[in-house]
């Protein structure tokens, strides 16, 4: 993937990264409340960020079109917890979003070779 990006052989895409300043303290990345708030924030921003505004040919039938997104996690355990919370909130908010999970064993470092 990193070679394809460098060679410009992939479709153009946008990404948003959020970094937290490291103050030396340990963050419980699997904290249930933390995951809940991050998922809530992500879903609130998703439709605008992806220009994936729901369209309807009638009120009961949303037209499925738009863009996909990738939400990366630090571990398999984190991916599972985020997946469950996304499914729960998508259902509660009745959003026209589908979610899937892919767990890869290879660590990808942007603009460098695969490690």
Curated annotation (Swiss-Prot):
Transmembrane segments: none annotated. Coiled coil: none annotated. InterPro entries: HsdR_RecA-like_helicase_dom_2, P-loop_NTPase. The middle section of a putative type I restriction enzyme that if reconstituted might recognize 5'-GAN(7)TAY-3' and cleave a random distance away. Subunit R is required for both nuclease and ATPase activities, but not for modification. This is Putative type I restriction enzyme MpnIIP endonuclease subunit middle part.
